[in-house]
């Protein structure tokens, strides 16, 4: 995760953007939050869709595992070693002593959006929205986790509204 944050910052600097809206889906939503905490001066807002939130709660994991087979299959070519490394770096982030203080004092507006039919419980996103000073939370009804794939028109309007809304 630390490398991904550094990569985002390098891209921002290379293209000469002063501030930007950082949007992400799933792990990318959590990355957007981490990036905003580490580089608040560069982030106008965060849009996190169907993220996990910085937690390793057993009940969350059990619900995720129990419902996995019910989700639409999205065939994404990925490298298992990279996926494992990203998971490990996420765990390292959740164990940081200053994690919650950094979130609670981050002045970046953050919009957390849950997918209504996601097997991932949305309570961590609602908690984050309540924790960060300028947090908002909403649920998009009747869409699964990967609704960018299953409902692209809903995805497009969700992202557009989130980036242009209050």
Q: Model regions: which residues?
A:
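Catalytic histidine neighborhood in serine/cysteine hydrolases
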Residues: 131-146
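Active-site loop/oxyanion-hole signature of alpha/beta-hydrolase fold enzymes
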Residues: 1-23, 157
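Short beta-strand/loop motif that positions the catalytic acidic residue
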Residues: 106, 112-114
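Flexible "cap/lid" loop of the alpha/beta hydrolase fold
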Residues: 30-38, 44-72
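Catalytic nucleophile serine of serine hydrolases
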Residues: 26
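Conserved alpha/beta-hydrolase "acid-adjacent" motif
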Residues: 119-124
């Amino acid at each position: 995760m630390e490398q991904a944050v550094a990569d985002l910052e390098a891209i921002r600097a290379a293209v000469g953007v002063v501030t930007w809206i950082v949007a992400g889906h799933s792990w990318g939503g959590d990355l957007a939050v981490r990036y905003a905490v580490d580089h608040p001066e560069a982030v106008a807002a965060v849009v996190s869709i169907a993220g996990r939130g910085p937690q390793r709660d057993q009940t969350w994991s059990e619900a995720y595992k129990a419902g996995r087979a019910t989700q639409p299959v999205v065939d994404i070519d990925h490298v298992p070693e990279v996926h494992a490394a990203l998971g490990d770096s996420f765990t390292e982030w959740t164990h940081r002593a200053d994690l919650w203080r950094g979130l609670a004092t981050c002045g970046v507006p953050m919009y957390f959006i849950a997918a209504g039919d996601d097997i991932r419980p949305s309570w961590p996103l609602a908690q984050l929205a309540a924790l960060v000073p300028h947090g908002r939370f909403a649920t998009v009804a009747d869409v699964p986790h990967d609704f960018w794939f299953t409902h692209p028109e809903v995805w497009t309007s969700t992202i557009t509204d989130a980036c242009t809304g209050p």
